[in-house]
Amino acid sequence: MSSVAAEAVQQRRSGFRERLDSLTAPSGLFIAAVLVIMALPVTRTIQDPDFWWHLRAGQLIIQHAGLLGSDPFTYTVANHHWTMHEWLNEVLFAVEFAVGGLGLIVLVLCTVTWLGLLAIMQKARLRHPGRGALGIGMLVAVIAGFPIWGPRVQMITFAFAALTLLLVERHLVKGGKAIWGLIPVFLVWSNFHSGFVIGLGFIALVLIAEVIGGWLHMPDPAPRERLRPLLFVLIASTAVSMINPNGPTILLYALGTQTSGAQQSLIEEWFSPSFHDWEVLVYGAMLLSLAMLTVFNRHIRARDVALVLVTTALSLQSARHIALFVAASTPVYIDQLALASPRMRAALRRLRRAPAPARTRARGQPPLLFRLTACTLLIAGLAGVYVAWLLPKMQLQPDSLAYAQEFPVCAAQWLAGAPEPLKIFNQYGEGGYLAYTLSPHGDKVFIFGDAALMGDPLLYTYAGVETVTPSWDASIRRAGTDIVLYDINTPLADVMAHAADWTKVYQDGLSVAFVPTDKLSTVHLPPVPVWPPGSVCARQAKAAPNTGAQNQ
């Protein structure tokens, strides 16, 4: 018995030593470096204009101890029913903000995004690619997703989608009971974001692809006996997703977004990616190289074909869906890269007319202590770089200069001093920040970023004003607007600056405000501010030192 125990101990020691050797080998250090480097592009300041109204909505949910049945932010669609499909995420935003400010929210969302990337890497590892292909593929994917990374609600769906695909692939490859873990995942996901229907769609797509792939005798099909549990998981996950304050209607909510002509044609994040933008070029290169690798290898699984084709179509339709392309297609890209590597090396040798490398005696590795020290120093150095990259993002406050250059921070500070609530016609992407800062004062905005709540008619009305159609003035006045706050150097601002029946009352380096001339005596505004030298707004206002504003 003692000899058996000693042998078991020896095997454990041997296995531990092998893992250490593997982790401290050059390829292991490369993967460790990739894991840290992946965190850099996804760690950014808050750039999503919708973040601010999500935060305020979460504060109101806590304040009212329940979901909001109608719109609290606008004076245009206050009677519309509000389907708060992101209520749990909004509540967490409010709690995190109360505990740790914006810094904690940035940290949590960036960590969630990194965990989604880790799930993608784990799915790719199920096919045992070389570490070179794994690391290179992940780096390409992270750069390809650069246009959409950052602290935003959609990263929750990205991470859950990556986790769903990992568990599905693990089940098809290895079997086991882990697939049933998707049921609680969808219970939570459906209360975080309506994007959970994407996860359900991925499972259904894999099931259909495997059935069709079996008929077509495509390579590496999943065992048929593993498809039935996956079908049961899909049914159960669909059922538990309806355990939600919105009930079964949550399943239909996302379809309204996908079928809205106004949202698809008017909202920038729903536009197709522009390949004239340098940020999109790596995504395009990844897409093109994936197609070339697939043709070169002539070997791809049915479920991989389905996932790549569907997410490619979605990402070409809308830039925001590049995240889904990265989640679904990166493991396929890595697999194709690994399949192509030996053939590409052989082809290069033939071009050089060089013989295959002769087998040589393996060189001994440096001592383990040396390798552990090098590994520790590398990881510590990269971690230090990441912390130096992260901390400035976490330290920014809502009224910092970085945000004042993107959002109407200074104009909101000015309007907050108004003695009475105002009805503000605003830029679509700035409605969220204005709702966050001014709704506690009773001010209302014309529009903000929940396009489904706004409805297509209001979106088209706003688009008509933004593009200065002949009815722009009537549309603003008909809504009962008190003041227009818009970005400088835009068509609307330029037209209003030359309109006799509109008076400019405020301007800073980002925004300009106008009041109908016939309302100057009835709209009570705060005095034009004089910002202290060196303040955030003084530095921002240097772009427009002479406002020419009139304020009664």
List PLM regions with ranges.
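Transmembrane-helix signature of polytopic, membrane-embedded enzymes
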Residues: 32, 120-143
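Membrane-interface alpha helices of multi-pass inner-membrane proteins
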Residues: 38, 141-145, 179-194, 236-241, ...
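Transmembrane catalytic cores of multi-pass membrane glycosyltransferases
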Residues: 62, 194-298, 332
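Transmembrane-helix motifs of polytopic, lipid-linked glycan transferases
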Residues: 107-127
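Membrane-interface transmembrane helices that cradle and orient dolichyl/undecaprenyl
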Residues: 164-179, 289-296
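Short hydrophobic alpha-helices at membrane interfaces in multi-pass membrane enzymes
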Residues: 170-187, 228-232, 305-309
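Membrane-proximal, lumen/periplasm-facing interface regions of secretory-pathway glyco-
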Residues: 348-417, 429-431, 442, 451, ...
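Short periplasmic/luminal acceptor-recognition loop of GT-C membrane glycosyltransferases, typified by
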Residues: 413-456, 482-486, 514
